[in-house]
Amino acid sequence: MIYTSSDGDWFNPNEIDQDTDCDEELHHLLKFGIIEGKQIESLKTLFFEQTIEDRTKSQYRARHSIFPNEDQPKYSVQFSKYHFDFNLKEGEKCKVGVTLKDKIKINSTGSGKTTFNFCNIPVHSPNIKLTFTPSGGVIKKGQSVEILVEMVVLCTTRVRELIAVDIANSGRHLFTIKIDSKMSQVLDYKELEIGNVIGGGGYGAIYKAKWRGLSVAVKVISELSDGSEFEKELEMHKELLHHPNIVHFVGFCVSPKCLVLEYIEGGSLDKYLHNPNYTFSPQLRLKMANDIAKGMCFLHRNEILHLDLKPQNFLVVSISPEAPVSIKLADFGLATSSSRSFYGPTVEGSFLYMSPEVFTQKKFSRAADVWSYGACLIEILTNKRPYQEYDQLGYLELARVREEGLPPMIPPEIEGDLRKIIEACFHRDHTKRPNFENIEQFLDAMTDSLFNVQSSIDSSSSLISSSPSTINNNGSSSGSSSTSTSPINTNNNNNNNNNNNINNINNNYNSNNSNNNSNNSNLIIQSANNVSSGSLMPSSPGKTTPPLKHSGSFLFSRLQQQQQYQQPAPVLSSHHPSSSSSSSSSSSSSSSSPSPPTTPRKATGVPIPPFSLPSSLLQQYQQNQLDKQLSSSPSNSSLTMSSSTPNQPPTPTQSNLNIVSTSPTSKPIVPLRTFLSSSNDSTCNNNNNNNNNNNNNNNNNNSNETLVKTSRAMTDLTLSDTQKSGAVPSRSVTISGSSFIKPISIENNNVNSNNNNNNNIEATSPEKYNSHRPLPVLPTSNSSNNLNGSIISTSNPSVSSSISQMSQLISKQQQSQQQQQQQQQNTPSRNVIIPNSSTANSSSSNLNITTPTRPKPISSSTSSSSTPQLPIGGNQHSHRPLPIRAASSFEIKNNHLNLSSSPGDLFSSSPSTFEITMMERDTEDLTKLIELRSRTLKCLKVLYYSFLDSIKSFSEIKELKDCIELGQKIRNFKKDVELQCIEHLKLGWETIHDASKKFNTNGKHLQTCPSPHPSNFDGETYNKVVQFRDAAVIVGESALDGLFYLMLQLLPSHNNYRVPILDITVSSTDKIPEKDLIVKIAKIARSLKS
């Protein structure tokens, strides 16, 4: 019994009755005082099993044994209570994250000062946050102090804490806290009983565990992870509400970081699909696909993208078709929240199920999940992995195919409506793919019809035998025609609304297919009453819809075959107006023939098609009625066995229904790589047009050729040896002029002497001419003829004149200069030649002006740095000097460079003509273009070798993180090259690849594949590094092909020698590329270098 002090709020330990029945172990632990490790847990276990009163008694006994005395020991302090309840009632639970407060008083009763200190045992607890204010101090004699205790529960846990207060000269006093928290998503890791490893996620291992008796799956985050993926997946689970097709989120732990999810006993779907011991029925496979679509539709409604759809992330709840849920989605490690398309920094996820825009452009959207869903449908329906046709070609070829964006081949076993869904999911344009809402609506209708058909197969015998009524051709009972036809009409009206939703799946998919037939424009779903068509949904009344290929749906065809073999008695099926071949014959036969019995229908949303009657009593009657109908209107007779051809014998009955057709299939052919140039639209057109008549085949061939030509015109570029002869447009390029001044001066001299047709210059007196030197004496007789002979008749020059013509022009000019020099040495006098404006051809006479003045003698030994020396012959003629004018810088430069030219040319002052200006400008542009080409080629070579060294640096990788970063760097560079080529050259990557491989005789740019040293990694990590390395090398080879192609377009042909470019010898006979091409490639090189 506990006694209180006179104040009413103090416990007096001295007045507590001693109980000798206390646990000796607990007494020993309390007496020992300072304990650690397992002893603390044992103390908590024993201590908290007792009530508050028993705990106080145990502490008093332990203290009394520490301080033995005959009299009752007089303690120096008194406490108001020894248990913190935080104002909660017994059994009441506290909230997580809320601050709880309590108070305790300490009274000093000793003869002096009392020192106290609070501490928690253990001091650091990850589940609660406990503070004492103040946590220690000194209490004077006769005084008391109030301690404020605050606690915050951080997770869902059971708080069992011991609080110790050390009192000087009085030992240690223990206080208890025993509180249970309410449920929350934050869990206590100590409450998890971790079991065996059951799998691995994107960033950690998955364990099977127990949490408060519940089987859970715990995904423990690796210590090497930065935690960003953990935070992302945690946010995804917090945002999601409960959905039957999403794995239930139990909670998470903060330390260590882990996610606690619902444990699914069945495991992943991947181990069932590729295990021959498991065989799934068509109903179960379709139900699995429908469950996945429901889960994805729920995610997209909540603006969440999964981005990692694959069979490994589909958990099997049950393999029974009658179970409410078969599949649940899991693993949101790559999921993200977004309401629109966006570009991410990295690409992760599964290689085979990743959409092309995610794999190549890192573009994430809802359509990316739709593409992955289509790839998963192939594996669920046929047990074949996507891109399985490339297994024999190896991993490298598969990586190249994925890089080019080719979709996987749809197996021929998938037929009808589901094939169209998969084709729509694989649409090249991601905006034309269906959404999961339309897919869910379509699969819901198909699943309901399929299960209704299966249930009607099982119950048709008992239902028909209990109601032997007759039916007419319209499907109504002879006894009550009005009551039996109304459910059919009601069902047709209800299901017509579903057709409008289902047709939305293919509206976008077929919008661009101009060659599609009208019967394939939408997803055609026929009436469930027409068993021969194999349809799953009734069509609209009065609308004729031709039957689908292969009986519309391969799922229904398998059920139909099973029905035929199990119930061999043929029976007439009810006809819908849309399925009748001739209305007139149908009406006549219905009025003349009696009605056989019919199958009662259930009141369901989808009508149950009639099946064969197994009753042996009605077989003879049915055979007689069948003979009558066949004789009366053979065109209207429709047997339930019409799904098989008349000449084809029935196949044996199969015990287990297969989801695929049993027709023999040829070995899948690997699609050609030229398929990249054609879109999915052309592929769908070819598939749809194969069912047309022979008249349409010619149109298909013509359309295919048009598509191929159009695609090649848009994406291909052929390397032509013949270049255009048009003039290169002028473009300002800053280069040095010293390399081409001499050819310009030579051409100017030639053109000045041969341009009499366009210049009308009158001969003037010598006083009108300004010169910085005296005019020379004109030569005698034959000088004009010699000069005229040195004039070269040139055509109107263009910028595109070839180098060979230029070299011939230069050689002729040199010969003429040599002749002029020889003539000048023989002539005794000097002359000035002024062209006459009246002459129109080379035979016209030139006006010769001779100066009669005597020139001043010039010494042959004198020289000038500004003007060349003039040779003076023996015949000295007197002349007077003309007014001196300043020489231009261009003339001075020409005088320095053309020392070998004739003196008469140096002093010729005739004005430049239009042809001379064009020649100067064209030659200058040509030289600048050649220099731009050489600089661009040098830049591309530097980029080529530097990028080659980057790929070779894989041999120096020591961590998986560095390998991923290097691979991403290589991918980004390849993408930059591709985008630049598309922007400037309008070229597809297939054209660049083919052209570079044509000239690159080595085949590959890398002779040996760089490999990191295996000692730096463990076995599993090294395999991942090798896979990343192989994919990066393939992408790097493609980027090197692009750089090599750009260099091939800049073949140097302005020099008369052979120039090696990356081990390829280029002939000098190649012509200079067009100016536009050089400028575009220069822009690409500048962009890549920056």
Curated annotation (Swiss-Prot):
Q: Which residues cross the membrane?
A: none
Q: Specify the Protein kinase domain's residue ranges.
A: 192-443
- Biased composition range(s): Polar residues: 531-543, 657-666, 675-684
Protein name stated in the entry: Probable serine/threonine-protein kinase DDB_G0278665
Reaction it catalyzes: L-seryl-[protein] + ATP = O-phospho-L-seryl-[protein] + ADP + H(+); L-threonyl-[protein] + ATP = O-phospho-L-threonyl-[protein] + ADP + H(+)
Q: Which organism is it from?
A: Dictyostelium discoideum (Social amoeba)
**Annotated active site:** D308 (proton acceptor)
The protein's UniProt keywords, in alphabetical order, are: ATP-binding, Kinase, Nucleotide-binding, Serine/threonine-protein kinase, Transferase
Record keywords: Secreted included? no
InterPro entries given for it?
Kinase-like_dom_sf, Prot_kinase_dom, Protein_kinase_ATP_BS, Ser-Thr/Tyr_kinase_cat_dom, Ser/Thr_kinase_AS, TKL_Ser/Thr_kinase
Which residue windows does the record flag with biased composition (Low complexity)?
Answer: 462-530, 560-593, 613-646, 685-704, 748-760, 780-825, 833-868
Q: What is its EC number?
A: 2.7.11.1
Query: Which intervals of the chain are annotated as region Disordered?
Result: 462-705, 747-881
Binding of ATP occurs at I198, G199, G200, G201, G202, Y203, G204, A205, I206, K219
Q: Which PROSITE patterns match?
A: PROTEIN_KINASE_ATP, PROTEIN_KINASE_DOM, PROTEIN_KINASE_ST
Q: Which GO terms describe its molecular function?
A: ATP binding; protein serine kinase activity; protein serine/threonine kinase activity
Q: Which SUPFAM superfamilies match?
A: Protein kinase-like (PK-like) (SSF56112)
Could you say which protein family the record assigns here? Belongs to the protein kinase superfamily. TKL Ser/Thr protein kinase family.
Highest taxon listed in the record's lineage: Eukaryota
